[in-house]
Amino acid sequence: MAASALSTCLWMLVLGTCVSLVVGTDCGKECALCVYRLLGQQSTLSSLTCSLECDGGLDSQKLRLCQDVLLEEENQSPLASQQDQERVDAMMADEEDATSPEHQMAKKYGGFMKRYGGFMSRRSSASSLEEAGNQDEEQSIRTEILKILNAATEHGGEGDGQEAEAVKRYGGFMRRADRGAAQGNLVEAVLGRVLKKRYGGFMRRVGRPEWLVDSSKKVGVLKENGSELQKRHGGFMD
């Protein structure tokens, strides 16, 4: 019984010695790998293997080198994370640019957009400003024509008493002709001034639009008809 207990104790001592030797060997190996890394050798182990567990197998100088490596990697880790974040932000910005309409146009037309893209954008902005100016000018033309027509209507209302007999006899034909001629002259004057303002000497070289010439001809025909009737019938028309 005592012999079996003694043999058990011996086996435990042997196992403990073997385990301590294995642990010491592993610790020495890790410290050696750490030193090799400090000396510029390539190693797959991280710097965490240079822990303080191996301080007994290293002198103070080598241990200080290991601590410097650990501190340097700890200082570089925030910088590395910041660089990774910047890289991710740059990739996201590139993806957003790739989906933008400008990027699609540049991808579709290639170097043409690079060469003439700025000109096209400036031309589009200038066209929008010109369209806005034309709309304002057209609105002012409408307003002025309405003023002329209202003034002609008021003027015609004042002369209704004097022309009542002529209207009764001739059915208002002469009054409509005279008013149409007067209003046509006023509208033609307004439109002619607007066209001259917009196109300048171009209208003098090319001429007036056909619709404006036709309108003036019609007004002239009405005037000629009125004068011919006046000449033919004399005081009977009065």
UniProtKB/Swiss-Prot annotation:
Residues 76-103 are annotated as: Disordered. GO terms for molecular function: opioid peptide activity; opioid receptor binding; toxin activity. Disulfide bonds join 27-50, 31-54, 34-66. InterPro entries: Opioid_neupept. Residues 124-167, 177-195, 206-230 form a propeptide. Its main location: secreted. Expressed by the venom gland. Moderately expressed in the venom gland transcriptome. Keywords: Cleavage on pair of basic residues, Disulfide bond, Endorphin, G-protein coupled receptor impairing toxin, Neuropeptide, Opioid peptide, Secreted, Signal, Toxin. It is found in: Secreted. Residues 1-25 form the signal peptide. GO terms for cellular component: axon terminus; dendrite; extracellular region; neuronal cell body; plasma membrane. Met-enkephalins compete with and mimic the effects of opiate drugs. They play a role in a number of physiologic functions, including pain perception and responses to stress. Enkephalin peptides found in Meiacanthus fangblennies induce physiological effects via their interaction with delta-type opioid receptors (OPRD1) (tested on M.grammistes). Therefore, finding a proenkephalin sequence in M.atrodorsalis venom suggests that this protein act in the same manner. Belongs to the opioid neuropeptide precursor family. This is Proenkephalin-A.
